[in-house]
Amino acid sequence: MSVLRSQPPSVVPLHLTTSTSRKTEQEPSLLHSAIIERHQDRSVPNSNSNPDSNHRIKKDRNNHTSYHSSSNSESNMESPRLSDGESSTPTSIEELNPTINNSRLVKRNYSISIDPLHDNSNNNTDDDHPNTITSPRPNSTSNKEMQKYSFPEGKESKKITTPSLNSNNCLDLDNSSLVHTDSYIQDLNDDHILLNKRVSRRSSRISAVTATSTTIKQRRNTQDSNLPNIPFHASKHSQILPMDDSDVIKLANGDTSMKPNSATKISHSMTSLPLHPLPQPSQKSKQYHMISKSTTSLPPENDHYYQHSRGTNHNHAANAAAVNNNTTTTTAATGLKRSESATAEIKKMRQSLLHKREMKRKRKTFLVDDDRVLIGNKVSEGHVNFIIAYNMLTGIRVAVSRCSGIMKPLTPADFRFTKKLAFDYHGNELTPSSQYAFKFKDYCPEVFRELRALFGLDPADYLVSLTSKYILSELNSPGKSGSFFYYSRDYKYIIKTIHHSEHIHLRKHIQEYYNHVRDNPNTLICQFYGLHRVKMPISFQNKIKHRKIYFLVMNNLFPPHLDIHITYDLKGSTWGRFTNLDKERLAKDRSYRPVMKDLNWLEEGQKIKFGPLKKKTFLTQLKKDVELLAKLNTMDYSLLIGIHDINKAKEDDLQLADTASIEEQPQTQGPIRTGTGTVVRHFFREFEGGIRASDQFNNDVDLIYYVGIIDFLTNYSVMKKLETFWRSLRHDTKLVSAIPPRDYANRFYEFIEDSVDPLPQKKTQSSYRDDPNQKNYKD
């Protein structure tokens, strides 16, 4: 009596699953039904009753051949189920056990699938009673029995090989090393694909005795919930070939005699998959393996599937042809729409990219490298003054950020209010942690907040410009004050260290300064944005002269994106007000731009070229500013003038931002709008942050002036009075700088008034000229 070993519930013998990987309820396995009906009355003997048969089964198990697909073998080599030393198994039907080649041929429809053989449904089967069923097949089968397994639909049924019987009439179905996975079995002699569901090598640690299998009835009842969803991988499914238009037409006409050939396979191979021509089947055998009807493993983008429909009824072929025709039409229309939309999208992206490149090209060239410093020395980590600069920026960031409530009308107390912040390594509720320990003091925060709003500054932009990167550029003061200048990253703002006396003078007159700025939006006085103090730890007492450092944040009068060709600092005095030029360096070094003074201005016959309208506006505003400074008991201030020559810039072939479009800009611009309200456009900052020169007919010329009153924090103190008395003993009081504030204001205004003329001035040898041989006095 033949013995057929049962399989575990997840084992599918490949010999019986070459047709399809799963079966629908409408197509029950007739072959399985025949086997079960014929052997229902067969008893299941004990494994001990036939030791020879068990011995042969164990022997065959040692020599079994696995039908693991190449793709799945590669993917499971790293799986913990594979023990060390195991390798992948053959992937084609031709590599099966040689005994299979002598098996009988069974004709059947390609749509018929064979389920696993019946097993005891009891999962708690004892190890002493392995699940076995007997095989009913003798070596010679009658014609009646053969008719049960043949299904003559169509012209010719495909033939597949079935496992052969051994000498004891036992069917060799021991494939315990195979379990279900989502994969394929590919025959190298044909282009047919076997869907083997889940195929991989079982772990050797799992005993075949403890494995159980489900009955055919259970298999049929649970097949809908066990439908595999096989993902598509190009490396595993490289030979899945779609149907072309000719195949669709044949299906529509009811022609089911399509035969695969190498030419069709090569021409239909997907471009994204590797192309491997498959060998032709033997002409003698003419045995073709059928392709499964399952389409769950194909990619969702493919609308056509390569199918062999021998043995398929005409109704099914007609339905498939109709679906394929509709799909082809829809795919063609969708592909055309996708092509047009893709072209439009690519064109839009190209235009956007070109626009971004153009905007980047128009940006300021000095900001290309964020770490580059154009003016002065770079103050970054490692610099001797980096700790001071770091503390300044950290204090400004915290103080300005906290001063962001609702703006209220200022009171007299706001002009005397100060706010202290203590920074340490750990931080607290008021201040964040800092890299260094220091104390920060903010003077009149609400007043300077109002001033920043009057000057049209946005708080966020203000903080970003100063504290976006803790990198500043340091510039020593060209004057005698000894102050340090730190430029922000975008060169819009300047941090200037001041003396304690200057800090006291500003705090004393901050209310007058605020009222003047509010009433005179076109004022020439320098714009102050904040007054602060940094107190360093006592450990810095030996490194710096003073532990307390007072500093101001003010505007940079000159634009960072334009070259200032010549600069003048005019006070109205002539004693020591001359700058010796290094002509050789001036010719070689284009960055050498010394600040010229009053005597240089007079020798060169320079004039501020303003027409009648601009001259009147300029002198009117200058008079108001000078009156305020005289009222505040201030002296030693000066008018800083920077001149940008448009023609010279073109001749030098300088790449200046928007310089070529200056002539096309209107003479006046509308008011600018900030978060706090409308701010009137500054009259003297209309063109690139400056004012355009004009002739006697009020026509613009190719010069841009940047003018402003600076250094107006010097109080006429007792020391200045003593200096005035000392200088008057040897020089005329009209020539020296240290004179009373009222006299200083009048002389200053008269000198500037004489310098404003649209016509060039003639060179004169006046009493302003100092003796060149005399030692210059640094004013």
Swiss-Prot record:
The modification Phosphoserine is found at S207, S225, S661. Residues 43-52, 64-79 have a biased composition (Low complexity). Signal peptide: none annotated. It holds the Pfam family PIP5K. It catalyses: a 1,2-diacyl-sn-glycero-3-phospho-(1D-myo-inositol 4-phosphate) + ATP = a 1,2-diacyl-sn-glycero-3-phospho-(1D-myo-inositol-4,5-bisphosphate) + ADP + H(+). Residues 726-779 are annotated as: Required for cell membrane localization. It is a peripheral membrane protein. The gene is MSS4. Its EC number is 2.7.1.68. This is Phosphatidylinositol 4-phosphate 5-kinase MSS4. It comes from the Eukaryota. Catalyzes the phosphorylation of phosphatidylinositol 4-phosphate on the fifth hydroxyl of the myo-inositol ring, to form phosphatidylinositol 4,5-bisphosphate. Acts downstream of STT4, but in a pathway that does not involve PKC1. May be involved in the organization of the actin cytoskeleton. InterPro entries: PInositol-4-P-4/5-kinase_C_sf, PInositol-4-P-4/5-kinase_core, PInositol-4-P-5-kinase_N, PInositol-4/5-P-5/4-kinase. Residues 376-756 form the PIPK domain. Residues 2-346 are annotated as: Required for interaction with OPY1. GO terms for biological process: ascospore-type prospore assembly; cortical actin cytoskeleton organization; phosphatidylinositol phosphate biosynthetic process. May oligomerize; forms higher-order structures at the cell membrane. Interacts (via N-terminus) with OPY1; to negatively regulate MSS4 kinase activity. Residues 1-100, 116-166, 759-779 are annotated as: Disordered. The modification Phosphothreonine is found at T222, T659.
